[in-house]
Regions:
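Anaerobic metallocofactor- and corrinoid-dependent redox/one-carbon enzyme cores
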Residues: 1-230
């Protein structure tokens, strides 16, 4: 889960990585829709045209209606772990989530498990649950999942899952989980500079280097079910 440094280190680095990959003709996908609540206008304002703007509005509103139809609020978001790590509100967490999209325009909005067909930044309908969201990314055609964390988790999706730490303490303590440490930004450097190192690392993963979770033999999957998933 996220912590107080996620929106300062790891998420901005992933956002800069996204911009870099898109500038080279690639595609990136942002999901975890409930974690966009409160910061969704940052994405809406970057939609390429009015049609995509309306699709983004529907993406957000449909997920809110999904919760309401089951008589549920967005419970435990931020989660207890998020709060212990320094996140106080949903908006705080959401502003961190949207940073992972960088600054590129939104080029497409995808339904759950819909295949990526457009270069650039895509938004995908899926919940905030780590494994469900990562499985949805894989189902939509993502070759690699970049997962930022300040609290740590050993999980992995069906595709190579690169675990990115927001703080050096986690990277040092769980070196068998964490692939890339963004905690160094607290002492030196910028997200743009570190994103180039992350880009090179992801190229290595795409070329056959195993992520820490692959070395451990972890390949998990979770399907979006009826009922509320945070």
């Amino acid at each position: 889960g996220s912590d107080g440094l996620s929106g300062i280190t790891a998420n901005p680095v992933v956002g800069a990585f996204s911009d870099l990959l898109i500038s080279k003709g690639g595609s990136t996908v942002l999901t975890e829709v409930p974690e966009m609540f409160g910061a969704e206008t940052q994405l809406m304002n970057r939609c390429e045209d009015e049609v995509l703007f309306e699709k983004t509005v529907d993406l957000i509103n449909n997920f809110k209606q999904y919760f309401q139809s089951h008589n549920q609020t967005i419970y435990e978001n931020p989660s207890p772990g998020n709060k212990k790590g320094g996140i106080s509100t949903l908006e705080d967490k959401s502003l961190g989530c949207t940073q992972k999209s960088g600054s590129a325009p939104v080029m497409d909005v995808l339904s759950y498990a819909e295949q990526v067909k457009t270069k650039g930044l895509n938004l995908l309908s899926a919940p905030g649950n780590d494994l469900v969201a990562s499985t949805a990314l894989a189902a939509s055609g993502a070759h690699i999942v970049l997962f930022t964390t300040g609290r740590g988790t050993p999980f992995a999706s069906p595709v190579p899952t690169v675990k990115i730490s927001s703080n050096s303490a986690l990277a040092n303590k769980k070196s068998n989980w964490i692939d890339f440490n963004c905690g160094v930004l607290v002492e030196d450097g910028t997200p743009a500079e570190l994103s180039k190192n992350l880009f090179d690392f992801v190229i290595d993963i795409a070329s056959g280097k195993k992520s820490k979770s692959e070395e451990a033999g972890f390949h998990d999957m979770a399907i979006f079910k009826q009922g509320v998933t945070l």
